């Protein structure tokens, strides 16, 4: 069994159509008997939007809180991809 890692950038998961396309690639590779790992970025523009909001709240934002906030973009993409795979 081969192991494949698929990386999808923000544009690749920017909307439902593209997200389904990414999910189909993951599912197809797995159906062929491969071990599949999906790595997903936040949707296009989402990280910038979160960063802008954080800077409105705290112009000097940094550290742990900012890291936690920005990671929600990836978590959103992961959850949506899991839904698309069902």
Q: Can you name each region flagged by the protein language model?
A:
Residues 1-86:
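Nucleotide/pyrophosphate-binding catalytic subdomain
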């Amino acid at each position: 069994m081969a192991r494949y890692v698929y990386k999808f950038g923000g544009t690749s998961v920017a909307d439902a159509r593209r997200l389904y396309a990414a999910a189909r690639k993951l599912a197809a590779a797995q159906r062929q008997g491969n071990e599949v790992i999906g790595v997903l970025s936040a949707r296009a523009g989402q990280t910038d939007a979160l960063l802008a909001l954080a800077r409105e709240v705290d112009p000097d934002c940094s550290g742990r809180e900012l890291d936690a906030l920005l990671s929600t973009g990836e978590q959103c993409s992961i959850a949506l991809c899991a839904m698309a795979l069902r």
